[in-house]
């Protein structure tokens, strides 16, 4: 082999080695840049979901449990204080967080009318109205009556001394959503996809109502005539957690949208003359609707782009 040929081969080998080295260096640099960008995109605030639930349960039940043993009038203030607890805990968690971004986020979620996708709220209301319609129709198979397509004269509970029953369900819809959407759901969603988040939240939110079963005058106390009705309430609440999470996300995490939907659900549950048996059928219908919503929004429920950077993520139609 000539000297010239050896030099050409040698230069070719060196060039190939340099190319491999440069490629490896560029790959390492890109990896470092991606890691740096990920750190920049991550939320600075660390959510504490389990501490929130401990506080929310404690400051609710510390008032509701004593309300079991007193008269309705005397228990009124205890009921109201317990109802306020999650919203107060949520607000305190945000205010003492030291995170201006979290404080601004809560403000926007509550009063940000511009965040509400009004047509999505309308569709959510229509969907729930259809759930009621189909539940009553299916209940005919179990001997129920078409007379359920009517409004009741009164609410099924007394309002527990907090004013009228309508005022009670209105307050519950507003106050609960400030607590659960103000901090709670985000604190879970920060660490996992929304499908698992909805399941965890639904279970914990459902069980939060437990003492109400034993407080005279409440809707839940009226269910104690049958274990089936009690179980149905808790299962239905878990499933509704998925639907209201959907309403929350398609309106870019608007609490106002959830308040409107929650109020409509509470009102329909009370004023439509469905029997307790039909409400058990309703839970089956809600399960079917929940499955459809999840399947049609797989990216929203199973995506993890928001994990670790929820405050920097925009939600809506495309999520």
Segments the model singles out, each with a brief description of its role:
Residues 2-20, 27-44:
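Short, Lys/Arg-rich, polar N-terminal cytosolic tail immediately upstream
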Residues 35-173, 201, 214, 270-319:
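Specific transmembrane helices
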Residues 49-53, 120-121, 183, 197-198, ...:
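Alpha-helical transmembrane segments and their helix-entry boundary regions
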Residues 134, 171, 184, 240-244:
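Hydrophobic/aromatic residues in alpha-helical transmembrane segments
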Residues 169-174, 206, 233-238:
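Residue-level hotspots within the lipid-embedded alpha helices of multi-pass solute transporters
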Residues 175-207, 249-254:
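Membrane-interface helix/loop boundary segments of multi-pass membrane proteins
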Residues 195-225:
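Membrane-helix boundary elements
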Residues 222-287:
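Functionally important transmembrane alpha-helices
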């Amino acid at each position: 082999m000539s000297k010239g040929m050896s030099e050409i081969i040698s230069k070719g080998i060196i060039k190939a080695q340099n190319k491999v080295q440069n490629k490896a260096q560029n790959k390492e640099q890109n990896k470092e840049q991606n890691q740096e960008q990920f750190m920049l995109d991550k939320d600075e605030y660390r959510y504490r979901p389990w501490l929130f639930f401990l506080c929310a349960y404690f400051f609710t039940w510390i008032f509701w449990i004593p309300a079991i043993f007193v008269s309705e009038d005397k228990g009124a203030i205890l009921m109201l204080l317990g109802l306020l607890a999650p919203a107060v805990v949520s607000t305190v968690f945000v205010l003492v967080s030291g995170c201006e971004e979290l404080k601004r986020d809560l403000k926007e979620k509550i009063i940000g009318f511009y965040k509400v996708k009004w047509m999505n709220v309308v569709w959510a209301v229509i969907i729930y109205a259809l759930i009621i319609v189909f539940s009553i129709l299916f209940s005919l198979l179990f001997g129920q009556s078409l007379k359920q397509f009517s409004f009741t004269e009164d609410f099924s509970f007394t309002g527990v001394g907090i004013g009228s029953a309508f005022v009670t369900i209105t307050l519950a819809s507003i106050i609960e959503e400030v607590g659960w959407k103000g901090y709670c759901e985000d604190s879970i969603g920060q660490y996992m996809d929304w499908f698992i988040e909805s399941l965890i939240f639904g279970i914990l939110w459902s069980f939060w109502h437990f003492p109400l079963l034993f407080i005279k005058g409440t809707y839940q106390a009226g269910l104690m005539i049958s274990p089936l009705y009690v179980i149905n309430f808790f299962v239905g609440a878990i499933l509704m957690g998925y639907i209201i999470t959907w309403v929350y996300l398609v309106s870019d995490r608007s609490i106002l949208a959830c308040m409107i939907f929650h109020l409509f659900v509470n009102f329909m549950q009370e004023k439509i003359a469905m029997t307790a048996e039909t409400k058990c059928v309703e839970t089956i219908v809600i399960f079917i609707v929940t499955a459809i919503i999840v399947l049609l929004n797989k990216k929203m429920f199973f995506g993890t782009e928001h994990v670790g950077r929820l405050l920097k993520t925009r939600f809506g139609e495309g999520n």
